[in-house]
Amino acid sequence: MAGAGLIIIKRRIKSITNTKKITNAMGLIATSNLRKSRQNLEANKAYYEAFNDVINKIVSSSSKSNLYVAGNKSDKKLYIALTSDSGLCGGFNGAVVTAADNVMRGDKDKSLLITVGQKGISYFKRLKYETLSEYVDIPNEPGLKEAKEIADRALSLYEKGEIGEVHVIYTQFLSTVNQKVEVKKVLPIEPKKMEKVSVAEFEPDAEIILEKAIRLHIEQQLFNLLLNSKASEQASRMSSMDSATKNANDLLDALNIKYNRIRQSAITQEITEIVGGAEALK
C-alpha cells in the first residue's frame, strides 16, 4: 500500500513541477512584455497630453454646432471593449466584460458593440451580445495601424448618423499592482473648461482644422487606450503567473513532506518486520 501511495505522490510531484516550469516561464515573459508596454505608454504620454490640449483649444474655438462637438440626432451608443487575445491573465478580461455588460444591459436596443481581442468575443457570445466588428491578433506592442482601423470604423458609423456616441471600455494602467476598468467617452468631443485662458486663433479657420484633426485625435485616443490595455494585461498575467508559481511551490512542499512521511513509515514498518522475524527465529 505504501509503495502504491508513493508512486501516486511522485507522479503528482512530477506533474506540478512541470506546471511550475510553465507558469514561471510565462511569468518571466509577461514581466518582459510589461516592461516594454510601460516604456511605450510612457513614451506616448507627453505627445498624447500635448495633442489633447491642442484639440481642446481647437474645439473651444470652433462652432458649437460642429458634428464632432454637438453630436448628431442618433440616440444609439457604440461601445468598444478592449480585451486580450490570450488568457491566463487573471480577472483582466472578466472585469472589462462585466463593465460593458453593466452599461449595456439596461439599454441593449440602443447599444452597439465592437470587440477587440479574442477573449472578448468568447465572453460576449456567452452573454448573447451581437457585435458590429471584431478585431483580433492585436500585437503586444500595438501601433497606430491597429488604432486607425478601429477609429475608421467608429468614425464611419458616427458620420453616417448610425450612432450618436462612442465609448471605449478599457483597463487603465496605474501601476504594476493597480489597474482600473474605465468607460471613456471619445465622441462627441467634450472640451474641458478653459478658465482665464484666451481662446486661441487658428489659421486656417478652426472648423477646417477640426475636420482634419478629428480623425487623428480619435486614432491617438484609441492608440493610448490600447497601450493602457496591453500594459494592464501584462501586469495581470505577471501577477497571475507569480501566484500560480507560488501555489505550485506550496503544493510541492506539502507533497514532499507527505512523501517523506509515507516513505519513513514504510521503512520503519519494514525494519519492525525484519526485527520481528529475527526475534521469531531465536
From Swiss-Prot:
Answer whether the UniProt record assigns the keyword Cell membrane to this protein: yes
Major place of localization?
membrane
A Pfam family name for this chain? ATP-synt
Q: Which CDD domains match?
A: F1-ATPase_gamma
Sorted UniProt keywords: ATP synthesis, Cell membrane, CF(1), Hydrogen ion transport, Ion transport, Membrane, Transport
Q: Could you tell me which InterPro entries the record lists for this protein?
A: ATP_synth_F1_ATPase_gsu, ATP_synth_F1_gsu, ATP_synth_F1_gsu_CS
Residue intervals passing through the bilayer:
none
Q: Which HAMAP family match?
A: ATP_synth_gamma_bact (MF_00815)
Entry keyword annotation includes ATP-binding:
no
Say which family it is in: Belongs to the ATPase gamma chain family.
The protein's assembly and partners: F-type ATPases have 2 components, CF(1) - the catalytic core - and CF(0) - the membrane proton channel. CF(1) has five subunits: alpha(3), beta(3), gamma(1), delta(1), epsilon(1). CF(0) has three main subunits: a, b and c.
Under the heading Gene3D superfamilies, the entry gives: 3.40.1380.10, ATP synthase, gamma subunit, helix hairpin domain
Compartments, record wording: Cell membrane
Q: What is this protein called?
A: ATP synthase gamma chain
What membrane topology was assigned to this protein in its record?
Answer: Peripheral membrane protein
* Gene Ontology CC terms: plasma membrane; proton-transporting ATP synthase complex
GO MF annotation terms: ATP binding; proton-transporting ATP synthase activity, rotational mechanism
Please provide the Gene Ontology terms (biological process) for this protein: proton motive force-driven plasma membrane ATP synthesis
Q: What does this protein do?
A: Produces ATP from ADP in the presence of a proton gradient across the membrane. The gamma chain is believed to be important in regulating ATPase activity and the flow of protons through the CF(0) complex.
